[in-house]
Amino acid sequence: MKITPDDIRHVAKLARLDIAETDINAFVSQIGEILDYVDTLNQVATENVEPMAHAISLTNAFREDTVREAGPVEKILNNAPAAADNMFCVPKIIE
């Protein structure tokens, strides 16, 4: 698939990206290389490959949850940048 400068401008507009006109040709080249690589990957025979979530088998090491004392509240709160009324103070992030 051949990528054109107009394709780059169109995708940039859709993504609301401000790309300098001087960078358009570099993106044409880079995205062209990426699509060529994807095309190469599409040629790999994967019909008999079982779908997987990870390339290697992983096993989770679970343990039982146990309730225990956390420690002295004052000592824990001393590690916080800000605390009040035995609670951590955090900046407001939602209006």
UniProtKB/Swiss-Prot annotation:
GO MF entries: asparaginyl-tRNA synthase (glutamine-hydrolyzing) activity; ATP binding; glutaminyl-tRNA synthase (glutamine-hydrolyzing) activity
Organism domain of life: Bacteria
UniProt KW Cytoplasm keyword: no
One matching Pfam family: GatC
Alphabetical UniProt keywords: ATP-binding, Ligase, Nucleotide-binding, Protein biosynthesis
GO biological process: glutaminyl-tRNAGln biosynthesis via transamidation; regulation of translational fidelity; translation
Transmembrane residue ranges: none
Gene3D superfamilies given in the database record: Glu-tRNAGln amidotransferase C subunit, N-terminal domain (1.10.20.60)
InterPro entries: Asp/Glu-ADT_sf_sub_c, GatC
Subunit record text: Heterotrimer of A, B and C subunits.
Function: Allows the formation of correctly charged Asn-tRNA(Asn) or Gln-tRNA(Gln) through the transamidation of misacylated Asp-tRNA(Asn) or Glu-tRNA(Gln) in organisms which lack either or both of asparaginyl-tRNA or glutaminyl-tRNA synthetases. The reaction takes place in the presence of glutamine and ATP through an activated phospho-Asp-tRNA(Asn) or phospho-Glu-tRNA(Gln).
The family this protein is said to belong to: Belongs to the GatC family.
Protein name per the record: Aspartyl/glutamyl-tRNA(Asn/Gln) amidotransferase subunit C
